Amino acid sequence: MSSSLWLQCLQQLQEELPATEFSMWVRPLQAELNDNTLTLFAPNRFVLDWVRDKYLNSINRLLQEYCGNDVPSLRFEVGSRRVAAPKPAPTRTPADVAAESSAPAQLQARKPVHKTWDDDAQVIADINHRSNVNPKHKFNNFVEGKSNQLGLAAARQVSDNPGAAYNPLFLYGGTGLGKTHLLHAVGNAIVDNNPNAKVVYMHSERFVQDMVKALQNNAIEEFKRYYRSVDALLIDDIQFFANKERSQEEFFHTFNALLEGNQQIILTSDRYPKEISGVEDRLKSRFGWGLTVAIEPPELETRVAILMKKAEDHQIHLADEVAFFIAKRLRSNVRELEGALNRVIANANFTGRPITIDFVREALRDLLALQEKLVTIDNIQKTVAEYYKIKVADLLSKRRSRSVARPRQLAMALAKELTNHSLPEIGDAFGGRDHTTVLHACRKIEQLREESHDIKEDYSNLIRTLSS
């Protein structure tokens, strides 16, 4: 009864929720029905609290719909339901691996194999290297916001249950948005939980270099043994595998071997897996076997929080109005924000002057001037029109069909987000519209970004295009 009832709920929730949300929060839940009490088991406290906060009403509604007057009471626990001892597993084919990678983490019976660095004694010196995980990048100094919330949540779950929760985890987004920080944070957390865990972080080019050295030294078997013995392999900028056929071939087999052993893989890229050119389709398909999450440019509040956090790290007092002044003008990525703040702090130290808005305007005058030239309302209109294959004149017209109205609302919201123009100025640039029309458009797009995966994806794509 419990399996069929919960299966009905799962099927309906899968239709109602965005695919990423369903995969991350709902699919890992297990169900058990006893004495008319349905217990949902979450893999950790974080997932339990999130599901209870976000989806409790939806689950109760479905139980009422499917059970009528005989609705079971609902409770949540951290853990897993009691299951019978598993039968010996048959030999698995690649198709079996593909099917299992999308199953709930708790149904995967094998545990990650933990090895120590001593296992690599036979690996030649050029190939054998330590973890490269940066101890400075941890979860507690990663600034969370709407733009990175899902990525951070997925990274935390992976670090709590490596090899079982979302394998592989694929993070994508523009430069300087925090993908590398999350990789290191996962690596640090895994080692904190298990000091014997073998975690390796590297840029994809290092993998290529290691393979070339192994071929030169006739040590390809040692290369394979080393990479397939890790508990977690964290590879940055996987797009640099493009057009490197021999490296892709070796990584393909390494990828399969790690997944077979329930060893964690986390990859990052500057674009969605299927959009990576020069990489074999079989690899791109595998990149999407687990969970794929976009890391978006930080919104204003997150940019301010990042500046305040970095100022605190430097033991510098940064007034709120100064942080907002910088954050409103530098929007593309975290690295740019940090660089600008470092310049402001250095100038303040050299001159002994207090950090005010006027001081920041002077210290960053060339950067601010360049930024204002980069994104204009005119540029936004042209980019949106091209993206939706309509004319700029359509955006300025009085037409109200959805094929025009929605892109117009998106363009207005982008103008508010990416420029310093007031609402009346934006309205005037869109065919002389009233500022209340612009405000309505901004609120509508903000709402749709929460409800519609397509609108969220379009908005992110346009932000990346305009900020690159």
Swiss-Prot record:
A Pfam family the protein falls into: Hda_lid
Top-rank lineage group of the source organism: Bacteria
InterPro entries the UniProt entry points to: AAA+_ATPase, Chromosome_initiator_DnaA, Chromosome_initiator_DnaA-like, Chromosome_initiator_DnaA_CS, DnaA_C, DnaA_dom, DnaA_N_dom, DnaA_N_sf
UniProt cross-references to CDD domains, sorted A to Z: AAA (cd00009), Bac_DnaA_C (cd06571)
Binding annotation for ATP: 176, 178-180
Coiled coil regions in record: none
Gene Ontology molecular function: ATP binding; ATP hydrolysis activity; DNA replication origin binding; lipid binding
UniProt region (Domain II), positions on chain: 84-131
Biased composition (Low complexity): 85-95
Main location: cytoplasm
Induction behaviour: Represses its own transcription.
GO biological process: DNA replication initiation; regulation of DNA replication
Keywords recorded for this protein, A-Z: ATP-binding, Cytoplasm, DNA replication, DNA-binding, Lipid-binding, Nucleotide-binding, Repressor, Transcription, Transcription regulation
Described purpose of this protein according to its UniProt entry: Plays an essential role in the initiation and regulation of chromosomal replication. ATP-DnaA binds to the origin of replication (oriC) to initiate formation of the DNA replication initiation complex once per cell cycle. Binds the DnaA box (a 9 base pair repeat at the origin) and separates the double-stranded (ds)DNA. Forms a right-handed helical filament on oriC DNA; dsDNA binds to the exterior of the filament while single-stranded (ss)DNA is stabiized in the filament's interior. Complements a temperature-sensitive E.coli mutant, the DnaA consensus is 5'-TT(A/T)TNCACA-3'.
Domain observations: Domain I is involved in oligomerization and binding regulators, domain II is flexibile and of varying length in different bacteria, domain III forms the AAA+ region, while domain IV binds dsDNA.
UniProt subunit comment: Oligomerizes as a right-handed, spiral filament on DNA at oriC.
Record's protein name: Chromosomal replication initiator protein DnaA
Originating species: Vibrio harveyi
Gene designation per UniProt: dnaA
